[in-house]
Amino acid sequence: MVGFTEIGLAAAMGALATIAGAFEDAESDVGSQSNPNSQVQLAPQMMNFHRYFNKAISGEPVSYMLYGAIAGTVTWVMMTKFGLPFLAAAAVGVGVNALIHMVFATTAHLGRMASAAEFGHPIYLDVVLSHLGPIAGFGGIATFAIVSLAYIQWALLKHPFPLPLLAALWGVTVGAIGSSTGDVHYGAERLYQHYPFGGGVPVAAHGNITRKAETGIRNSMDSVYFCAKFGNPLTGLCFGLVVFFSTWAGLFGQWGAVIAMGLVTLGCLIVSNRVEKKARESYGTYEDVEMDEICDPV
């Protein structure tokens, strides 16, 4: 019989996964990482200079596998070799990883921006300094949640894999979900806001990203402010539901998990349909426009 302890662990893992997914996507938005990054990288070649932070050397799954492995390894060493409790050990592991994270972010951004010097693009040092804090902060929260997930599996559920390996695997998973779920709202929704609603991103517009903010010139902090309203929570919800319902298979059997996931999927489809219909009724259908009718993003 399933007890309250097992249900509590499943709920805790789902909550931690939700936090990890939301803040992982927020961190990638601050740093212009993963799919939309190609548009930020292409912009200087199209003579569209910008103030976005641009740090993607690898995709989110690979980078968060590294961050999870680093934080998980340091946490495991602090617990097994120095006898620290989990929270203290995790704080040390996340702190060490945050320092490495900022080093990688800095070198990646400076390297990419330096490569754009051929097109006359400058390096804005204030952009580097102002974005490193949120990158380390959001990444630290996501990494702490990842390590906590791994700890629950390793220490409480007695998973045969060691904690560092579990943290690395969770890092790959949350990075993949953040890349596939959250990037839409940073890419087509935010980088191309000066184009008509619902038109997508035509090939001819690649690199012609939005550079004006509500006030002044846009940077990546504006992007995460926008994505925190919908894209980040949606990513967290996606990862949280995946983890939560995957634990249901062990708690309530295969069919219990299938039925629960089916009901949630049906509910999401209904909500998505209602939201899209309301958006179309509010903003109208997409109409073709001439390029000279589109506002200048400079």
From Swiss-Prot:
GO molecular function: tetrahydromethanopterin S-methyltransferase activity
GO CC field: cytoplasm; plasma membrane; vesicle membrane
Protein localization: Cell membrane
EC number: 7.2.1.4
Major place of residence: membrane
InterPro entries noted in UniProt: MeTrfase_E (IPR005780)
TM helices/strands, residue ranges: 3-23, 59-79, 84-104, 132-152, 160-180, 230-250, 251-271
Superkingdom of the source species: Archaea
Any one Gene Ontology BP term: methylation
Catalytic reaction annotation: 5-methyl-5,6,7,8-tetrahydromethanopterin + coenzyme M + 2 Na(+)(in) = 5,6,7,8-tetrahydromethanopterin + methyl-coenzyme M + 2 Na(+)(out)
Enzyme class, first EC level, given as a word: translocase
Keywords from the named record: Cell membrane, Membrane, Methanogenesis, Methyltransferase, One-carbon metabolism, Transferase, Translocase, Transmembrane, Transmembrane helix
Function: Part of a complex that catalyzes the formation of methyl-coenzyme M and tetrahydromethanopterin from coenzyme M and methyl-tetrahydromethanopterin. This is an energy-conserving, sodium-ion translocating step.
HAMAP family: MtrE (MF_01098)
UniProt similarity note: Belongs to the MtrE family.
Assembly information from the UniProt record: The complex is composed of 8 subunits; MtrA, MtrB, MtrC, MtrD, MtrE, MtrF, MtrG and MtrH.
Protein's recorded name: Tetrahydromethanopterin S-methyltransferase subunit E
Organism listed in the record: Methanopyrus kandleri (strain AV19 / DSM 6324 / JCM 9639 / NBRC 100938)
Lineage of origin: Archaea, Methanobacteriati, Methanobacteriota, Methanomada group, Methanopyri
